[in-house]
Amino acid sequence: MSSETQYDYLLKYLIIGNSGVGKSCLLLRYAEDEYSDKHIITIGVDFKIKTLTVDSYKVKTNIWDTAGQERFKNITVSYYKGASVVMLVYDITDLESFNKLGEWLIEVEKNAPNNVYKILIGNKSDLSENRQVSYDQGKVSYFNTRNLLILME
């Protein structure tokens, strides 16, 4: 590791999904270990950096939070370039956000590198009393059939 880079590995994460599924909250929780229940719509993209130590290696993660609105899709397409991991997020209390995952996966397949890792995230599990999408639905509908690496809630 050179003193200029200050990391051994660089990973680019891209968070995608419908507007309102909690992508920005995931980013804030991961990068800064904070939570905000105020919904602020992302315009274009947001970006955070977090450096981790994994088995004595410094891993720098660049995490890109994309806007979920249709009008920003042309802007966010360029952010797929060089992505190591794409996190597809849906809201477990919003069936429509789950049903739109197929469209998001098509975007990933068209725009991301062939070797990108895909992670499916069912968000807002703290609101499980309002659940519209079961864990098994995610597993059967997307995880088992679309070559995803991880499914988590």
PLM-predicted stretches and their roles:
Residues 1-153:
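TRAFAC-class small GTPase G-domain
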